[in-house]
Amino acid sequence: MKAIIFSKERYGDPGPESLPNLAHLRLADVPVPDFSNERWVLIKSKIAGICGSDIGFLQGKPMPAGAPYFAFPVIPGHELLGEIAALGKKVRGLHVGQRVSIDPTLACRERGFTVPCPHCRHGNPGICERVTEGILSPAIVIGTCRETGGGWGEYFVAPGHRCFPLPDAIGDDEASLMEPFCVCLRAVLNYPPRKKELVVVIGAGTIGLMNIAALKAVEPSCRIACVAKYPFQAEMASALGAEYLVDSQHDEVMERVGELARSIGSLGEEPYWQVVCASCMTR
């Protein structure tokens, strides 16, 4: 199969007009992943997103939470949409040809442990304690694991229980955004806004905009101030429900946010507020 391989090895001079470190990528013919596990599935990649962490790797700025836990070379791509190509004999509820969205997490269950670590036991597999152990190479997600491959290849493998069938009403483009949106939705559900609360979203890239959508879905009455860098980002933030827009290139951000909080208080409402940092999902 064809796949984009990411390695620390450089494959020639990228030239002055290329992206930083683009020479660490190459298109190559590689074997289809053959992780023989009767509870896993082989998936044909349809769309794979380019995450901020992927861009960081290409620019030589690895994600601190993930970089120590995998070894090059890898096939990137963890924002996944695909079509099932083959099933392990113990996989149930799925069929060949089915479109699926994939949770790329590789935690205790995926690594073959029957007794989960404390984080997995409490529903937090994203911070599993065993990301270097078990039946898989060290990695936190599909797309950083040697055995699984990733969405930047024609095929990859995934656990059957991490595959979620998609209805026909959801198109491929929308479905390709499910993984990053779920990250935002989880953050909002962990710290849901109160009624009419002012929530400040710092950043209006893809994750910032998805945070706005998630906030409005969970608590439609919350008021959102979005700190945006570019006019087109501000327009999209407004379309998704942001009532207040802060221009990070011209406004004094925290002063402007303080003014918004005080204005809410002047209306006789409690000026409580919280902040979402879209770049790191910290709240």
What feature does the model see in each segment?
Residues 1-79, 150, 154, 158:
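Short N-terminal strand-loop motif that marks the start
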Residues 31-48, 63-121, 167-169:
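Glycine-rich beta-strand-centered segment in the early N-terminal region that forms part
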Residues 67-69, 108-202:
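NAD(P)H dinucleotide-binding glycine-rich loop of Rossmann-like/cofactor-binding domains
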Residues 98, 197, 243, 270-273:
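Conserved acidic residues
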Residues 102, 201, 247, 276-277:
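Redox-cofactor binding/interface segments in oxidoreductases and associated redox assembly factors
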Residues 161, 167-251:
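Mid-domain Rossmann-like dinucleotide-binding core that forms the NAD(H)/NADP(H) cofactor-binding site
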Residues 252-270:
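Short amphipathic alpha-helix with an adjacent loop that forms part of the alpha/beta core around
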Residues 268-283:
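Rossmann-like NAD(P)-binding element
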